[in-house]
């Protein structure tokens, strides 16, 4: 535990300088959207609560709480006909829990325009799709402390150029021992910069001043490198009410990104009979705001549980984001 905390502190100390130098300058922004309606409906304040399959996106340490194989799918409808698809699977094994995750940020077909054809009269189209694939491992280090790690491969693609890299997430949760009070932290998207390469950046330099020389000179435009959206998140969760069939859970997280000012996210979840849920939250990240959602969970048969969830995210300038998710454990 001491080693993990030391790593977290070293990275945290370096983040303020990075944030000032790269304000608004990181790439792979699709990684910031997270996944799973429960966590999103509470404003993304999930780093301490992290007790379900959604933990694979926010704090891998939370996967250690899973006691059965679990599969989850999430569909998000964003602005400009963009879709965000998330899929995750986790199962107890190897003395802990192993998880797999995939994220797809899909633009759909867009009309190709060029300097010569600025209205796209050719009718040609292209896509801008981003993907991330993760492998996670989490385990209970003590009866109070969990730790987890995710390694992921990231690929951003625009037509015939792409930028590929890798990153990892590191997290932990700690049960204080006072009621249901729990603390959590996560460092996400720590990895090398991305840089676009590909066919659309290739050209023939030629010798325009010497037309008599008929020779191709292949060359490439070199794109500028851009950093990952590095994030340090520290949170707390506590059950304000836990009586009979009623439970009210509060969550509060502080965010320290490398490309925005520090902010916070917060949320509440009311659960009845551990089967029906109503959620509300606030996402303090730039241009975001109120969030909300509903959920239900039921036993399909002996040992098989299924959950369906919905979330709504307001946006200051763009259309609201709606997500739907389904998960099953067996």
Regions flagged by a language model, labelled:
Residues 51, 67, 82-83, 131:
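Short, basic and Ser/Thr-rich N-terminal targeting/leader segments
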Residues 44-47, 69-79:
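Short strand-turn segments of transmembrane beta-barrel domains in outer membranes
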Residues 18-67:
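Outer-membrane beta-barrel biogenesis signature
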Residues 4-15:
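Sec-dependent N-terminal signal peptides
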Residues 20-40, 84-330:
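Outer-membrane beta-barrel porins/channels
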């Amino acid at each position: 535990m001491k080693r993990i905390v030391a790593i977290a502190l070293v990275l945290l100390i370096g983040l303020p300088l990075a944030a000032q130098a790269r304000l608004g300058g990181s790439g792979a922004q699709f990684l910031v959207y997270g996944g799973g309606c429960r966590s999103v409906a509470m404003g993304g304040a999930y780093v301490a609560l992290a007790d379900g399959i959604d933990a694979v996106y926010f704090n891998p340490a939370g996967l250690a709480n899973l006691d059965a194989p679990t599969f989850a799918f999430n569909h998000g409808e964003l602005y400009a006909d963009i879709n965000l698809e998330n899929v995750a699977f986790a199962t107890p094994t190897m003395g802990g829990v192993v998880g797999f995750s995939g994220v797809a940020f899909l633009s759909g077909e867009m009309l190709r325009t060029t300097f010569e054809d600025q209205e796209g009269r050719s009718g040609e189209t292209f896509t801008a799709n981003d993907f991330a694939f993760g492998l996670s491992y989490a385990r209970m280090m003590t009866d109070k402390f969990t730790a987890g790690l995710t390694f992921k491969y990231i690929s951003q693609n625009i037509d015939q150029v792409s930028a590929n890299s890798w990153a990892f997430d590191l997290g932990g949760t700690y049960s204080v021992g006072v009621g249901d009070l729990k603390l959590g932290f996560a460092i996400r998207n720590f990895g090398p910069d991305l840089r676009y390469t590909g066919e659309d950046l290739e050209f023939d330099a030629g010798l325009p001043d010497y037309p008599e020389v008929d020779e191709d000179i292949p060359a490439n435009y070199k794109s500028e490198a851009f950093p990952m959206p590095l994030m340090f998140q520290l949170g707390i969760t506590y059950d304000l009410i836990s009586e009979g069939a009623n439970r009210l859970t509060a969550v509060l997280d502080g965010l320290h990104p490398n490309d925005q000012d520090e902010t916070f996210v917060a949320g509440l979840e009311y659960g009845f009979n551990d089967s029906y849920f109503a959620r509300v939250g606030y996402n303090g990240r730039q241009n975001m705001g109120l969030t909300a959602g509903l959920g239900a969970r039921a036993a399909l048969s002996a040992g098989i549980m299924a959950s369906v969830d919905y979330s709504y995210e307001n946006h200051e300038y763009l259309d609201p984001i709606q997500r739907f998710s389904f998960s099953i454990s067996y």
